From Swiss-Prot:
Keyword Protease: no
Protein name (record): ATP synthase subunit beta
Binding site for ATP: G164, G165, A166, G167, V168, G169, K170, T171
One GO MF term attached to the UniProt entry: ATP hydrolysis activity
EC numbers: 7.1.2.2
Annotated keywords: ATP synthesis, ATP-binding, CF(1), Hydrogen ion transport, Ion transport, Membrane, Nucleotide-binding, Thylakoid, Translocase, Transport
Length: 486
């Protein structure tokens, strides 16, 4: 809880210049606000309409002036208006009362559900946890999704990049992860919509309500808080909304001692917003026109996303890659912070393999014997090598047909196709579309299942029995059903 100084003790300044989202404010001598303090402007514009604007101090210019970035539109702002130094950074509500609600960058509810029932707030700027407070032992975060747990496992308190185009299942994967952490880990999630389409944010909210992740009748039973600063917002809001969502997640980790899932969609827009205001703040642009503080900006956000001895924040971040150029400074800087990458492939979605996670392109720093154990590591590598061989043989199959392959290669293709099908899985949040009940698969069941396919134990089962099932027992049951129907 951060105490805000009373209005009478707050310093008042005067707006002297407005350039787009950036404004200069003059204060009395010796009364300049601190960097990152929130300034509040409440006045009427020349047309008689009310203006209520919050801006964040970014620079001290000299001559008793500061330069600040507005968190909402500056239309109607004129020189001479009064600005009040709140004496503290932007603060947002935190705690259970945020679950099931939608907020803007300032922590104001925008879902027309009335005020937030909490007095607890926290500033969006704070230092990353100390090294002595960090949980340094790598621990795998079980998601219950076979392809992720086996081939690109997530680290508890780690950061995951989610790469995928439109319509390949990013949103459904995000929803399933939120659902699984709520049910299996008793945890909560925070979703930060950074500079993406407002329609997508609305669709996500409606889907959360349909799937029960947000309980519209009893918000206290909800498992996710949402924080949006979308495409239509000024760059100041898009630059800070990620921090607002992170602050809500930090409270669940540090105060409630919970494991939290933080989704950021899209991390590139956070960088893009910083780039937009950088030139207006008078900074010299750096490589490809990005802000010279790019590394610092990304680092300040990413270093706060971590595991402590109290709990963890595991972050899943959608990463837009401009012009598919992975060497662009924005994605390149982000990559340095990621522990795992989950790549969604349109070719797999077209085959009906859901989740459409590419088993060969997705990577994780956790997939090493010292972390996951020898059995898991060997199984994962054997699965990848079988799929890789199948990929190499596809050209030959397309030209000459399956019959021209050697006996060994035919067996490899048969097992690879079963593996590919077995990597699919019905999701809880997709039950209303598929009519199939969702499956959460334990890691040991996943490893055992793939080992049985690789060893040839299941060579006599039909390929279709492996499609959209949970563990290997369900495969056998489905095979029996297929056999009896013939």
């Amino acid at each position: 809880m951060v105490a805000t100084p009373s209005i009478s003790s707050q310093t008042k300044g005067v707006v002297r210049q407005v350039i787009g989202p950036v404004l200069d404010v003059e204060f009395p001598a010796g009364k300049l606000p601190k960097i990152l303090n929130a300034l509040r402007i409440e006045a009427k514009n020349p047309a008689g309409q009310d203006i209520a604007l919050t801006a964040e101090v970014q620079q001290l210019l000299g001559d008793h002036r500061v330069r600040a970035v507005a968190m909402s539109g500056t239309d109607g702002l004129v020189r001479g208006m009064e600005a009040i130094d709140t004496g503290a950074p932007i603060s947002v509500p935190v705690g259970e009362a945020t679950l099931g609600r939608i907020f803007n960058v300032l922590g104001e509810p925008v879902d027309e559900q009335g005020p937030v029932n909490t007095k607890d707030t926290a500033p969006i700027h704070r230092a990353a946890p100390k090294l002595t407070d960090l949980e340094t032992k790598p621990k795998v975060f079980e998601t219950g999704i076979k392809v992720i747990d086996l081939l690109a496992p997530y680290r508890q308190g780690g950061k995951v990049g989610l790469f995928g185009g439109a319509g390949v299942g990013k949103t459904v994967l995000i929803q399933e992860l939120i659902n699984n952490i709520a049910k299996e880990h008793g945890g909560v999630s925070v979703f930060g919509g950074v500079g993406e389409r407002t329609r997508e944010g609305n669709d996500l909210y409606e889907e959360f309500k349909e799937s029960g992740v947000i309980n519209a009748d009893d918000l206290t039973q909800s498992k996710v808080a949402l924080c949006f600063g979308q495409m239509n917002e000024p760059p100041g809001a898009r630059m800070r909304v990620g921090l607002s969502a992170l602050t809500m997640a930090e409270h669940f980790r540090d105060v409630n001692k919970q494991d939290v899932l933080l989704f950021v969609d899209n991390i590139f827009r956070f960088v893009q917003a910083g780039s937009e205001v950088s030139a207006l703040l008078g900074r010299m642009p750096s490589a490809v026109g990005y802000q010279p503080t790019l590394g610092t900006d990304v680092g300040e956000l990413q270093e706060r996303i971590t595991s402590t001895l109290e709990g963890s924040i595991t972050s899943i971040q959608a990463v837009y890659v401009p012009a598919d150029d992975l060497t662009d400074p924005a994605p390149a800087t982000t990559f340095a912070h990621l522990d795992a990458t989950t790549v969604l492939a349109r070719a797999l979605a077209a085959k009906g393999i859901y989740p459409a996670v590419d088993p060969l392109d997705s990577t994780s720093t956790m997939l090493q014997p010292s972390v996951v154990g020898d059995e898991h590591y060997k199984t994962a590598r054997a699965v990848q090598s079988t799929l890789q061989r199948y990929k190499e043989l596809q050209d030959i199959i397309a030209i000459l047909g399956l019959d021209e392959l050697s006996e060994e290669d035919r067996l490899t293709v048969d097992r690879a196709r079963k593996i590919e099908k077995f990597l699919s899985q019905p999701f809880f949040v997709a039950e209303i579309f598929t009519g199939m009940s969702g499956k959460y698969v334990k890691l040991e069941d996943t490893i055992a299942g793939f080992n049985m396919i690789l060893s040839g134990e299941l060579d006599d089962l039909p390929e279709q029995a492996f499609y959209l099932v949970g563990n290997i027992d369900e495969v056998k049951a489905k095979a029996e059903k297929i056999k009896s129907e013939k």
